[in-house]
């Protein structure tokens, strides 16, 4: 343990734990006050800063389009002759199951019901237009923008890990072209990584907050187990045991196998519901929803309800409660998902990673909403089951299983659905614990150390379990979203970082004929590296010193000209004179020239010393570099 613990990035490891405890203990000791403060912060974030999240969503989409159609997208993540580490089916299953979790089972079934009774655009609840938008908005919130936000960190992280061969999986390392090596490895970089871990732990608590009641409801239907905190704690314990073992086994034997089981199980469930339910209705409604989404994509992506509360405009708070909150939610999970996507995409081009993630991720989410969601909508519209009434009276989990109970062989369907909830939760937390272990480890050329993965696996379940019993889980969920606010700036920096790094390296490559670009020649010195920044500083100081020397020469010339003018005046007068006997204009010119010369000489000496110190610093940085 002693030797392996030396690989741990201790400031990040202990800093993240300290920040988490600093937030959690006040929530435990003062739950009401903590909840009020977090609620105020969340309202400020969504109401006053919501336009920033909407802008980021569009910027993320635009950036992914740029990546796909630029030379950056053709860069291969790995060696020139390297095949993808995972087959496409396994890769798609891993990124979908690892990035979505049981949340898709929850919201895929019931999200439409919230839109149905509280629709966007000031529509009448339960109206025909409300029905159409209820079937559409889920696709929007879980579609290309969500996956584009997920992928912002994935590009620079994958590039630095597989192309530049940096054995770390950290957000701070991916920011090196923007922050510089010194800041990236220093305090600013540690703060970025700590904030990421805190946001991820809080976000994970939210996922468990959805999954545990959902699984408990399923067990209640199947076995009559009571729906209380103790049962939910037992559920979390089972999920923890599954993903702890999977995390211990690693990517190939753990996450990959669980994801494949989950993927095919989910496809089987969706196929059965599609066949057993109102097939034509689900297909036609799904197709109509896709068309409505495409026709109104930019309207939905930019709508912030700006006129709400003015005149006759009603302030429904829909975009703040749903779209903006969703974008903030995806942003909190983006670093972890980006790290995970980067880790499993070896052997693919950046274009394949980006386009594949958006396509398979959006497609998977669309299928859940188009089949499970539209099945519930059909029950509501046909009068077979008042899903909305059950939702309002008994909660979302009861409404979901009441829907499933209407299917043929409902007991088997509920059993499969509950099992999928367990495995979805396990795969999500498996990938999160893997990423957390990677972030706090200084070298991950292979896989994070097993004890490190196990530590985070149990931390992920222990924290939500305690807060669930104490009633502070929902507050932590909101706190994580609020705490992710700095990620708005970090996301922009990550996009800039990706462009800077790839552009620099592409300039060092020969002309390519093949569509895939293999980065073979790297610059001798990166401008953001310690030696690159030291050299740039030396060049800057040297230029300043040379400019000061030139100003000194100009000052000498000006003084000589004044003295020449004085000599001419004295000769003209035909007698010797003291300085104070000269005309006032000549006295002032002489004093000004001498003062100017003195100032430029002092400045030259100062800047020359700074240039010399910068040169010494550069030599020291180069001397401290490890031998290749």
Task: Walk through the language-model features, giving the residues of each.
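N-terminal alpha-helical transmembrane segments of multi-pass membrane transport
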Residues: 1-130, 271, 496-502
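Extracellular/periplasmic helix-exit of transmembrane alpha-helices
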Residues: 107-119, 161, 165, 273-296, ...
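Membrane-interface interhelical connector segments
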Residues: 295-316, 375-411
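Flexible loop linkers connecting adjacent transmembrane helices
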Residues: 2-4, 36-42, 69-88, 113-137, ...
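Helix-loop-helix module between adjacent transmembrane segments
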Residues: 4-28, 61-66, 100-104, 141-213, ...
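Loop-to-transmembrane helix boundary motifs in multi-pass membrane proteins
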Residues: 5-21, 180-190, 225-244, 248, ...
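Membrane-water interface regions at transmembrane-helix termini and the short interhelical loops
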Residues: 1-6, 30-45, 64-84, 134-142, ...
């Amino acid at each position: 343990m002693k030797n392996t613990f030396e690989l741990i990035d201790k400031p990040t490891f202990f800093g993240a734990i300290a920040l988490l405890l600093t937030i959690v203990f006040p929530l435990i000791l003062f739950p009401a006050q903590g909840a009020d403060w977090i609620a105020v912060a969340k309202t400020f974030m969504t109401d006053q800063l919501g336009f920033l999240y909407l802008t980021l969503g569009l910027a993320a989409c635009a950036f992914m389009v740029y990546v796909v159609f630029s030379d950056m997208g053709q860069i291969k993540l790995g060696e020139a002759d390297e095949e993808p580490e995972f087959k496409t089916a396994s890769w798609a299953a891993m990124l979908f199951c690892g990035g979505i979790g049981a949340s898709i089972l929850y919201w895929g079934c019931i999200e439409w019901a919230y839109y149905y009774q509280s629709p966007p655009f000031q529509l009448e609840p339960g109206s025909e237009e409300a029905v159409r938008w209820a079937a559409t908005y889920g696709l929007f919130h879980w579609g290309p923008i969500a996956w584009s936000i997920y992928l912002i960190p994935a590009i620079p992280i994958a590039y630095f890990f597989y192309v530049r061969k940096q054995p770390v999986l950290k957000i701070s390392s991916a920011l090196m072209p923007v922050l510089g090596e010194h800041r990236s490895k220093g305090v600013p970089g540690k703060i970025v990584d700590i904030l990421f871990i805190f946001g991820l732990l809080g976000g994970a608590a939210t996922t468990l907050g959805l999954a545990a009641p959902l699984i408990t409801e399923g067990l209640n239907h199947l076995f009559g187990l009571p729906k209380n905190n103790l049962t939910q704690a037992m559920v979390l314990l089972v999920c923890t045991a599954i993903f702890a073992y999977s995390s211990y086994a690693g990517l190939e034997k753990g996450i990959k196998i669980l994801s494949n089981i989950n993927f095919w199980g989910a496809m089987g469930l969706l196929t059965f519901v599609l066949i057993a339910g109102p097939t034509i209705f689900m297909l036609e409604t799904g197709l109509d929803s896709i068309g409505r989404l495409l026709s109104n994509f930019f309207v939905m992506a930019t709508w912030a309800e700006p006129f709400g509360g003015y005149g006759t405009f009603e302030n429904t708070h829909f975009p703040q409660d749903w779209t903006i909150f969703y974008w903030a939610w995806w942003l909190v999970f983006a670093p972890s998902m980006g790290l995970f996507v980067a880790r499993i995409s070896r052997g693919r081009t950046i274009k394949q990673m980006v386009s594949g993630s958006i396509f398979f991720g959006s497609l998977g989410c669309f299928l859940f909403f188009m089949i499970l969601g539209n099945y519930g909508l059909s029950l509501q519209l046909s009068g077979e089951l008042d899903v909305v009434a059950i939702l309002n009276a008994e909660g979302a989990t009861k409404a979901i299983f009441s829907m499933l109970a209407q299917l043929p062989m409902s007991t088997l369907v509920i059993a499969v659905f509950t099992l999928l909830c367990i495995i979805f939760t396990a795969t999500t937390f498996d990938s999160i614990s893997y990423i957390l272990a990677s972030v706090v480890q200084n070298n991950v050329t292979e896989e994070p150390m097993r004890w490190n993965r196990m530590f985070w696996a149990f931390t992920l379940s222990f924290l939500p379990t305690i807060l669930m019993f104490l009633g502070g889980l929902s507050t932590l969920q909101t706190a994580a979203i609020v705490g992710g606010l700095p990620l708005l700036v970090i996301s922009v920096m990550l996009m800039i970082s990706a462009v800077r790094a790839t552009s620099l390296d592409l300039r060092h490559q020969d002309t390519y004929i093949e569509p895939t670009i293999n980065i073979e020649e790297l610059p001798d010195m990166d401008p953001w590296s310690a030696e690159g920044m030291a050299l740039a500083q030396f060049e800057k100081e040297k230029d300043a010193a040379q400019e000061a020397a030139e100003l000194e020469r100009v000052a000498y010339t000006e003084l000589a000209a004044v003295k020449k003018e004085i000599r001419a005046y004295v000769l003209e007068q035909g007698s010797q004179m003291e300085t104070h006997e000269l005309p006032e204009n000549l006295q002032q010119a002489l004093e000004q020239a001498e003062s100017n010369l003195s100032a430029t000489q002092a400045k030259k000496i100062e800047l020359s010393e700074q240039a010399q110190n910068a040169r010494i610093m550069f030599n020291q940085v180069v001397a401290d570099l490890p031998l290749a």
